[in-house]
Design a protein with these regions (language model features):
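Short hydrophobic core segments
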Residues: 409, 464-468
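Flavin-dependent oxidoreductase catalytic cores
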Residues: 1-386, 390-406, 414, 461
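A conserved short coil-to-beta-strand element within the FAD-binding core of flavoproteins
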Residues: 451-463
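Acidic, amphipathic alpha-helical patches
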Residues: 301, 438, 458
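Beta1-alpha1 glycine-rich phosphate/pyrophosphate-binding loop at the start
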Residues: 385-452
């Protein structure tokens, strides 16, 4: 098998993961306002577990509603959230996957003012990200102690729900990162100054969780902020050494922060495996497992694992685009893997821009697995699809998958419509891959395509069709 090395088991602490594929943590913005996750989210994660992923890291679950700031992610404050969490855990375990609960104490300076107009909290009175004229409120030592208590409480909730591991969100210039980084941490007490002091907030979180539950702890951290005055890769090495000594069982590493948000949601422009460069240096400094994210492909994943610079490779949006990616690779059917086009339109864009739940430009079933499930038709119809653009191709694919007889009429000599035109630049190769994927799928489904045929309003083919 081409990707054998990706299908070997590996341990994080006492947790054995069946392969090297990790679903990167991404919010879905689909939970209920009370902090309980929704059934759509359960179906979403189960589909990825069924698709062969070894470890799923859920999008961040907040300590309390104030930190969540209205975003519809889970909140680990009260025990009434446990039943729904147990359901998602058991749904993923059913398919042999492990599942990790990511816990967050919020975005700090990246947050908006609260409902009373008060500035967000941060490590120091650093400027707010969205309004530099507004200075953040530094956390007091009492505030910090409360956060440690809340982390322990949230960890217990995660443990009771059955999670296999816990990840601390120390990434992207969020609150934990604001303590770790001198560009934002100007404190003069025991939480500021030296690297050891700046790491105290993070290591106390690790200790709070470790004292509360016996689960592996993963720490998510960007090793290279990629902006002037931000933390560099070299400067981060001392920090990950401190994290290992504090008891962290694995590191989830990449690059970027809100000042370089193109790396937080890596675009097509950045190319493949755009953050794997952090792994080689990190490997020299720690002996715990390393996982890495950032526009990976099966080929880049294989290179990274075979180099031993990382132990797990993380895929985020690719698993949104095709939940069965892993199983298709394992069965040597890479041609059936639907590619993520790295557009950020219907995943990140829907959540950030429209405040609605996650979907996908190439997979409308994402977060709608049950409602949009493809089921065998009760009566076979003759269906005509006019135009072989992306909408026509998907309509034809779904209709044929349901069992209908489908024919496409396209006025040019090629499929893809504007996708094929847009795919001209080298960095848009993912669009070419999507067009090729449609070609393969339609061929396997015996969809007939008539090229150079412009359908007229009175065309006989329309009269003969059961559905257009």
């Amino acid at each position: 098998m081409k990707y054998d090395a990706l299908f070997t088991p590996f341990k994080i602490g006492n947790m054995e993961v069946k392969n090297r594929f990790v679903m990167a943590p991404m919010g879905t913005n689909s939970s209920h306002i009370d902090g309980c996750i929704a059934n759509d989210e359960i179906d979403y994660f189960e589909a990825r577990a069924k698709g062969g992923v070894g470890l799923i890291i859920m999008g961040c679950q907040f300590l309390n509603p104030d930190l969540a700031q209205g975003s519809l992610e889970g909140i680990l404050q009260n025990s009434y959230v446990i039943p729904q969490l147990t359901t998602v855990v058991e749904a993923t375990h059913r398919w042999g996957a492990k599942i990790c609960c990511q816990i967050s104490c919020g975005t700090g300076r990246n947050a908006f003012p609260n409902m009373y107009g008060e500035p967000p909290f941060s490590s120091s009175d650093t400027p707010s990200t969205f309004n530099p004229e507004m200075k953040c409120r530094p956390l007091s030592e009492e505030d910090i102690k409360k956060i440690m208590t809340e982390f322990a409480n949230s960890a217990i909730i995660a443990k009771n729900a059955g999670f296999d591991a816990i990840e601390i969100h120390g990434h992207a210039g969020y609150l934990v990162d604001q303590f770790m980084s001198p560009v934002w941490n100007k404190r003069t007490d025991e939480y500021g100054g030296s690297a050891e002091n700046r790491m105290r907030f993070a290591t106390e979180i690790v200790q709070s969780i470790k004292q509360a539950v016996d689960l592996p702890v993963i720490f998510r951290i960007a090793l290279d902020h990629l902006f002037v005055e931000g933390r560099t890769l070299d400067e981060s090495m001392e920090l990950i050494e401190i994290l290992e000594k504090a008891g962290v069982d694995a590191l989830d590493i990449d690059a970027g922060c809100y000042e370089r948000i193109d790396y937080i949601f890596p675009t097509a422009y950045l190319g493949d495996a755009c953050m794997d460069y952090v792994c080689k240096e990190a490997r020299k400094h720690v002996n715990i497992p390393i996982m890495n994210a950032g526009n990976h492909t099966p080929e880049s994943a294989l290179r990274l694992i075979e180099s031993k610079d990382a132990d797990f490779v993380m895929f985020g949006r690719q698993f949104i685009a095709d939940p069965d990616t892993v199983n298709k690779l394992m069965s040597d059917h890479e041609e059936d893997v639907r590619p993520c086009i790295r557009c950020n339109e219907e995943c990140v864009g829907r959540i950030v821009g429209r405040l609605t739940k996650l979907s996908c430009a190439v997979n409308p079933q994402a977060c709608e697995e049950e409602r949009f499930a493809i089921k065998p038709c009760s009566q076979v119809k003759n269906i005509v699809v006019i135009g072989a653009g992306p909408a026509g191709l998907e309509a034809a694919r779904v209709a044929a998958a349901e069992g209908h007889n489908v024919e496409i009429y396209e006025k040019t000599n090629m499929i893809g419509g504007q996708l094929s035109v847009a795919a001209t630049p080298k960095f848009k190769d993912q669009l070419k891959k999507l067009v090729k994927w449609f070609e393969v799928q339609l061929n396997k489904l015996d969809v007939i395509i008539h090229f150079n045929y412009e359908v007229k309003a009175d065309d006989q083919i329309l009269k003969n069709a059961d559905q257009i």
